[in-house]
């Protein structure tokens, strides 16, 4: 198969090795050989994983009309073991989507409504004196659940937001000198309203960087709003549980073992480097737009999210289009734009879309026999990945 090009070498084994290669193996994905598979003891096949994931997404879409991209990206974030920030105006089903996901995935769920008078002990827990025992007991907070909905997180003061950092980054909380680990699986899904400015505390860069994905949730389209009205005029549908926490952990392990070819890894690095030194990639005009580029967490996040998306689509290897599909959601919230860019109403999403458009993706290098085989068996893939006349560009 032509796309087996992205399944041959060991994952991120060395960028120099990938650059020296000039041909593609003629082995096809359908020949039954495990080329470059990360985990030979996977608990289920890719087809079975894709079927379960599809059923889970289908159950959520029984409740959520439209918003297909948000639903898919929520699944990607959970499978990538990441935290997710949903941004949208009130009433676009952010909270309902998270609650439905928790039901479908079978995990415990807690919703924390962030307010200006919230204190850290309200969310992580505190010591409580027991008169009968004459000792202090630890009362854990609501964040010790599989899925935590931090509703309107930007309404909480800085000390509460900072209390979330250890939990999100280390997946543990320290109370009175004791460390309490978060359960498995564990994801914080936060929401915020982009239009409100009174009584809000904007998330600092350090906390935004902890979120794997930031998903913009738009208004539903006209036909979708009509369907919402139709469904809610009768008994609202309820999602059914499809997975268990143990199954979610197994799927997360499968996602982390999805194969990443060296050429795709090199492409990820180039995308991130382009946000730090845009002039080196033919985008000198962005030098006055970007104040601070993406951190190395963006590099790791792109690979993790692309792996999860590949698993959602039933593949055990990552394509460049997987990276492109998650680039805006992974990278945009990590950029710090200049004051000039903000004054000109330039958004971080626009900048990332420009970077993705300007940085060329890797393409397989075929000889004539391989080209004819691919043209016969995978004509659609040829349309996306035309054979280049020169080897992939070096860093």
Language-model region placement:
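C-terminal engagement/docking regions of AAA+ P-loop ATPases
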Residues: 25-32, 38-43, 280-395
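Conserved C-terminal "switch" segment of AAA+ ATPases
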Residues: 46, 50, 63-64, 200, ...
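Pre-Walker A (pre-P-loop) alpha-helix and adjacent loop at the N terminus of AAA/AAA+ ATPase modules
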Residues: 48-84, 89
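Conserved alpha-helical scaffold flanking the Walker A/P-loop in AAA+ ATPase domains
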Residues: 73-76, 129-149
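Walker A/P-loop
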Residues: 78-115
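Walker B catalytic acidic pair
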Residues: 88, 151-152, 163
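AAA+/P-loop NTPase substrate/partner-engagement loops
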Residues: 104-132
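Canonical AAA+ ATPase core
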Residues: 130-135, 152, 156-160, 168-258, ...
